[in-house]
């Protein structure tokens, strides 16, 4: 420990002797002034950035594509002089980039037209040059009216610092084409959605219960899959049409035919469940057990319904039809002419009734 303290004291003594010398005094004076200036500049920059709003801070720190970013090699200084009775001979146009921030005040003013044999044409100005500086005043962020007032106040002598605006003109043309393409895409998309809605209505009828395709955005319409099958309304219409056709087919059968009343109705004693099948000739109700039904129906075909004196059907068939068709009205069926004539012949009326009742 004593050796370390001795070395420390010796180094401190040498440093004190150096600081007491004239060389250190001149060096400290020079570096001290520089350090104070740097600290003052850093403090001023920090105070300036701290007083800006948050949006302005990001804009001041991340600003790009500004007129001040161009190097001096890309700049051109032009002096235009005119007489009292003539003009400079150029037209300007202000342009704001479309991809800039909303809080950005960046705006370019460029020369859009040059008259031949004018002072501007003789001075070397070209169409597309960007006006970066006019008479020592930077035009960055100036509006069209401010630039015009600045040119008019310059008198007959105009000193313009220009930049090559070829890239800006190309970007302007591309952005104009982009806007046209966006408008065309919007129109075509509206037509596509209208056609898709018409197709949906043609397949499903009334599209009131379906989600409207016009209220969907691009993402929902891109996820719109294939159209579903027939809705419940179509199934109900098929069911009603089949019932009405079956009803008309049953009502067309009368007791006038000698073959009797033929039908494809079979009763299932265990379940009583029926299923519907549609064929090209007629519609009939068959039970779910197809094989048993075919065996039973083969023995029950061509069955005649006996007509009683009151002209109504037998209780068995009447009960079956009432249980199947529910509220369908029953049509009274008249007997054949031969049976009505046999009733007036004595001795034959009872025999005919007994013979038909055995069936």
Curated annotation (Swiss-Prot):
Interaction with CYTH1: annotated segments = 166-188
Q: Which GO terms describe its cellular component?
A: cell cortex; cytoplasm; cytosol; early endosome; nucleoplasm
In its UniProt record, which GO terms are filed under biological process? regulation of cell adhesion
Q: Does the keyword Endoplasmic reticulum apply?
A: no
Q: Supply the alphabetized keyword list.
A: Coiled coil, Cytoplasm, Endosome
Tagged with keyword Coiled coil: yes
Q: What induces it?
A: By TNF and bacterial lipopolysaccharides (LPS).
Per the record, what is the consequence of mutating residue 329 to S?
Answer: Found in a renal cell carcinoma case; somatic mutation
* Stated consequence of mutating residue 90 to A: No membrane-association. No change in the binding to CYTH1
Entry's PROSITE patterns?
PDZ
Top-level taxon = Eukaryota
Q: Which residues form a coiled coil?
A: 166-188
InterPro entries under this entry?
A: Intracell_Traff_Signaling_Reg, PDZ, PDZ_sf
Which residues does the UniProt record annotate as the domain PDZ? 77-166
Functionally, this protein is described as follows: By its binding to cytohesin-1 (CYTH1), it modifies activation of ARFs by CYTH1 and its precise function may be to sequester CYTH1 in the cytoplasm.
What PANTHER family has UniProt attached to this entry? CYTOHESIN-INTERACTING PROTEIN, GENERAL RECEPTOR FOR PHOSPHOINOSITIDES 1-ASSOCIATED SCAFFOLD PROTEIN-RELATED
| Full protein name | Cytohesin-interacting protein
Origin species: Homo sapiens (Human)
